[in-house]
Amino acid sequence: MGVVVVNVMTLLDQNNALPRTSVDASPALWSFLLRQCRILASEPLGTPVVVRPANLRRLAEPLMDLPKPTRPIVRTRSCRCPPNTTTGLFAEDSPLESTEVVDAVACFRLLHRDQPSPPRLYHLWVVGAADLCVPFLEYAQKIRLGVRFIAIKTPDAWVGEPWAVPTRFLPEWTVAWTPFPAAPNHPLETLLSRYEYQYGVVLPGTNGRERDCMRWLRSLIALHKPHPATPGPLTTSHPVRRPCCACMGMPEVPDEQPTSPGRGPQETDPLIAVRGERPRLPHICYPVTTL
């Protein structure tokens, strides 16, 4: 059977921009989103498969009760550095702890190619920032695949780097969905009540039938056309992906920034906050307007 339902679950700011990477949004917000994903994925009519970034391991405890093959991870860094499995809230999965795939597209193709006996119905969930969701949305538009889009929208802007997505990757119409209520004494209860919880469907691309036929004919001709022996193209990562701080020549940001005279303890260098690995902050977003 293969994949019958595809869901993309992510975060949006007031400008409908996604955080570029996981470290560009608050760990508390990712933890809440992953918890909601686990609740929504508990559908009785299919097997849920949740794809997430590897650097959300310490926040993805609600997903770890799923069987290992149904909770694959993607190492979304564009560099080939060894995974950081020990330091910070955005530490990655240890080797062999979870099933690894190249990206969400590879997971979708694998599930479609899988032919177990008896056939299984898969509900695919792609949960993460732009470095995971944007390449998959581009692929879905290319193959004319409809996607259910589920998001938590904040009224502020991201602390880190945002990634604006084309409007064709967003649903035209959305309705509200109800999150699983937080405990009455939850420290983020008041803050989470200010957010919008949006659900919509991203429709497939509007390519005409003639264009699809021409593309099919070109691919058929290319199969039988002789090609000179040339080395294969070098694989490059998607532009949305970003290397680690060491590859960019920047030092790791410590947990506590030293204070200097005239600066408060909560003030951090805005250059470090945007370009480097975001330090741990007590808030989720920078308010755009001053109260």
From Swiss-Prot:
The keyword Acetylation appears for this protein: yes
Family statement: Belongs to the herpesviridae HHV-1 US2 protein family.
Superkingdom of the organism of origin: Viruses
Modified-residue entries (N-acetylglycine), positions: G2
Keywords carried by this UniProt record: Acetylation, Host cytoplasm, Host nucleus, Host-virus interaction
Subcellular location(s) per record: Host cytoplasm; Host nucleus
Disordered as annotated region, ranges: 251-270
SUPFAM superfamilies cross-referenced by the UniProt entry: Immunoglobulin
Full protein name: Protein US2
Description of how the protein assembles with itself and partners: Interacts with host KRT18.
InterPro entries membership: Herpes_US2_varicellovirus, Ig-like_dom_sf
Annotated GO CC locations: host cell cytoplasm; host cell nucleus
A Pfam family reported for this protein in Swiss-Prot or TrEMBL: US2
Signal peptide positions on this chain: none
